[in-house]
Every structure is written in structure tokens, then in C-alpha cells.
Amino acid sequence: MLPATFKLCAAISYQHLRNVTGLRRQAAVAISQELSKLSCRSTGPSTWISQVRRRSSLLSSRLEEKPFSEMEMSYIKQGEEALQKSLSILGDQEGWKTETVADNGDKVLSKVLPDVGKVFRLEVVVDQPLDAVYSELVDNMEQMGDWNPSVKEVKILQRVGKDTLITHETAAAPPGNIVGPRDFVSVRCSRRRGSTCVLAGMSTTHGAMPEQQGFIRAENGPTCMVLRPLAGSPSQTKLTWLLSIDLKGWLPKTIINQVLSQTQVDFAKHLRQRMARAAGC
């Protein structure tokens, strides 16, 4: 009886692991397929799309190095979904309208999507190499509140593997306090391959951070930042930031659009200042 029971338990456990592994492979296959579509639709970003595809092809084998719980796999899947959706939006060059163009060339564009709403796209060049920008945005993520006036605090709630994080972000009140206190709980994933980095995210839930008194729990995503060296100038970084946020509450769309586009412009300005100080300029 005991050997039979053991075999039954082992079979159930094996089947569970097969199912979890299948989810991992499905995530990698989905991203690879989406990137293939993007490469066919758009010739502009085909180089970095190919680089990310090579990175995602390693996803299944790398994830299998350590078994994850169902909750952890859920976070990984959410991060991959944010990555896939973001790349799909950025890969479609049609329908973008210019919101603002700064004197230094910084540009904010927008687009209305049926299933997402209005999204914003920032395109800037940072006079620092990719490694330095990546380190500031990823490795020093919890220090963002020190230099970004739109952010009060970023806290990492949980790490899942090497590339997935769950974070809590508290937004700083904008001038005039036209938008009340907001906070976010997000799942973030990063993919880096060669000279291309993609940082994607979307809203999620986490037991360690229920809705906080005095804050409206807003939602974001899909969002993503794409970093790659500026063509012909590897000491500079081309940064593209896709922003999609639902601030919740009763706010006129004109105010929301103004706040979000200005948030992107301010981010670029303060990121440059932060990078210049770090480089001793």
C-alpha cells in the first residue's frame, strides 16, 4: 500500500511541475511570436526587437533553474504580458499624435487605443552610456524618489527570480495638488540582450501592500522603457518610455492628459540632472 501511495503522490507532483513548466514555455513562446509580428510590421526597431527575441528564447531554460510557486509564476506571467503588450503598442507606428516637442528635441506623442485608453510615448536622448542609465533605473530603483519630483517613494516588495519585481510606488503631489495622493502596486520585468534593454510593468496586487488610507490606488500598464545606444554615438542612450495610467477618481481628461505628458517631460529633465551628478559633471 505504501509504495502505491508514494507512486501516486510522485505522479501528481510530476504532473504539477509539468504544468508549471508549460506556463513558462507558453510565456516565452508568446513573446517570441509577438516580437516576430513586430519585426514584420516595422523596419525601424527591427534590430532591438531581434535582440530581445534572442533574450526571450532563453526564458524557459533559465526559469527552470528554480521551481516557482503558483503565485510567483503568476507574477512572472503578468510581467511577460506587460512586456508583450508594450512591445506591440510601440511596434505599431500608425496613429501617434505629437503632444509636445521641447527645444532640446525631447518629444511626447500620444495615441488612443480601444482596449487601453490614451497612452503616451516619450522619446529622448540621454548623454550617458546605456549601462549607466540602466543601472540608475533598475539597480537604483528605490532611490528614484531622491531625484524624480513626481515620485515620493519606490519600495521593492518582492523579487521573483532575477528579472521580476513587485513594487509599491507612492506618487508625489503635483504643483497645485490638482491630483490627490496616488499609489501603485506594480509587477516589473526587465529583459536585456546585447545593446537593448526593455523594462516593462503593469499593475498587480500583493498581500503585503493592501490599499492605504489617504491614497487612491491607481493603476498603470502596460508600461515600458526601451533603452538602446544612440546610432553612431554609443556614449549616448536613446530612451523610449511608453506610459499608460488610470489615475482613478473623478478627474477631467484634460487635466489627466496635461499631468501625464508633463510628468514624462519632467522625468527626462531630472534623469539627466541625476546622471550628470553621478558622472561628476
UniProtKB/Swiss-Prot annotation:
Q: Where in the cell is it found?
A: Mitochondrion
**What Pfam families would the database entry show?**
START
Expression by tissue = Expressed principally in steroidogenic tissues as ovary (granulosa from the largest preovulatory follicle and stromal tissues) and adrenals.
Instruction: Summarize the subunit comment.
Output: May interact with TSPO.
Indicate where this protein is primarily found: mitochondrion
The record's keywords, sorted A to Z, are:
Lipid transport, Lipid-binding, Mitochondrion, Steroidogenesis, Transit peptide, Transport
START domain residues: 67-280
The GO terms describing molecular function are:
cholesterol binding; cholesterol transfer activity
What are the BP-aspect GO terms?
cholesterol metabolic process; intracellular cholesterol transport; regulation of steroid biosynthetic process; steroid biosynthetic process
Query: Do the record's keywords include Transit peptide?
Result: yes
Its recorded name reads Steroidogenic acute regulatory protein, mitochondrial
- What pathway does the annotation place this protein in? Steroid metabolism; cholesterol metabolism
Free-text function comment from the UniProt entry: Plays a key role in steroid hormone synthesis by enhancing the metabolism of cholesterol into pregnenolone. Mediates the transfer of cholesterol from the outer mitochondrial membrane to the inner mitochondrial membrane where it is cleaved to pregnenolone.
A GO cellular component entry from the record: mitochondrion
What is the extent of the transit peptide? 1-63
Write out the catalysed reaction: cholesterol(in) = cholesterol(out)
Q: Which InterPro entries match?
A: StAR (IPR029866), StAR-like (IPR000799), START-like_dom_sf (IPR023393), START_lipid-bd_dom (IPR002913)
